Amino acid sequence: MKKNLTELVFILDRSGSMQGLEGDTIGGFNAMIEKQKKEPGEAFVSTVLFDDQTEVLHDRVKVSDVQPMTEKEYYVRGCTALLDAIGGAIHHIGNIHKYARNEDVPEHTLFVITTDGMENASRRYSARRVKEMIRRQKEKYGWEFLFLGANIDAVETAGHLGIAPDRAVNYHCDSEGTRLNYEVMGQAVSAVRCSAPLDEHWKDAIEEDFRKRQKSGRQ
């Protein structure tokens, strides 16, 4: 494996229910990437946008070469084909690693999945198949998967996909919640890139915000 090289895969919801949060999503993502450019080590970035279709915005682009996302790429529409986005990305990255020389395979692989609603439009992949794919990559190759969900039970949904409770978190799908998501996401990515242990506390800030606003009734 290639030391100090990380495979980063971002799977981002852009279905119709994300309307009104385009600017926050674009700004949060771009700020996170800019911070990653300053981190030590190398990284490849893949970004998959999904609604009822899947669009690959970045396909293993060196983090230093990633251009800012704009409203031309991130615009909301359609339904939520979450399983197709996850399954397609795992298949693609898995094949690249499978046929690469061992010394070229990244030391770390991290998938970050964000969605603000229930799966309702996938045609190619089932939950059972995606769960098996995730299990295999985690057990055999040590891949990490983080799941950030709004308007659903994120822990339960992630569990159906084989993602552990300590790797899933509920968030408020608004401007404040979206900004916090990308801030925390960036911290988790930095930890993985420098081989620091990613414990259950990676999501504390998001959980605190979610509980506080849920308790006060402020959405």
Language-model features, listed with the residues they occupy:
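Acidic, low-complexity intrinsically disordered regions
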Residues: 1-219
